Regions:
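Generic structural signal for well-ordered, non-transmembrane alpha-helical segments
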Residues: 9, 13-16, 42, 46-53, ...
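Short, contiguous alpha-helical
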Residues: 123-146
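Disorder-to-helix initiation segments
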Residues: 1-11, 81, 88
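Conserved alpha-helical segments that form or flank metal/cofactor-binding pockets of metalloenzymes
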Residues: 33-72, 142
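Helix-loop segments that flank and shape redox-cofactor active sites
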Residues: 1-3, 18-43, 105-120
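Acidic/histidine-rich alpha-helical segments that form the ligand environment
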Residues: 53, 57, 76-126
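Heptad-repeat coiled-coil alpha-helices
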Residues: 24, 28-31, 61, 68, ...
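Non-transmembrane, amphipathic alpha-helical segments
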Residues: 3, 7, 40, 91-94, ...
Length: 146
């Protein structure tokens, strides 16, 4: 059912893109707060990575194929690719913005699943929303200027 599959694939692509960007930042962060950002980005990318395979399996459970090529994922995602190495603070700010996009796409997929009574999928997506709300909290706290 395309009404579920289309937003589900977008949410998957946004999740995968956020995972890649977060790991990229984890590898390349520098500066006086290196360790704190390195650990924060590591915590986030590990959690998001853990969702990639179950997300793909949810797409397969809908009798669709999970997107797997970088070309297709880049067509689906709203997250902008990173080609530079920004400051640690800018990394956290960009991840917060990207996480907001993931929250939006997961909510859209959840709403579609709910509309069609796909309760198991709704539960999975609600769990994803909870995790991304926690990531938003961590990132907001890391960039807050006291």
């Amino acid at each position: 059912m395309e009404e579920i599959i289309t937003p589900l694939k977008r949410a998957f692509a946004d999740t995968f893109a956020m995972y890649l960007k977060t790991q990229y930042y984890h590898w390349n962060v520098e500066g006086p707060d290196f360790y704190q950002y390195h650990e924060l980005f590591g915590t986030i990318y590990e959690e998001v990575y853990g969702a990639v395979d179950p997300f793909a399996e949810q797409i397969r459970a809908q009798l669709a194929y999970a997107p797997g090529s970088f070309k297709r994922l880049s067509e689906l995602t709203r997250i902008v690719d990173e080609e530079t190495v920004p400051t640690a603070l800018a990394m956290a700010e960009r991840l917060l913005a990207d996480n907001t996009l993931v929250l939006m796409s997961v909510k859209e997929a959840r709403d579609a699943a709910d509309k069609y009574g796909e309760n198991g999928l709704v539960n999975f997506l609600e769990d994803r929303l909870d995790n991304h709300k926690k990531h938003a909290w961590f990132l907001r706290s890391a960039i807050k200027r006291v």
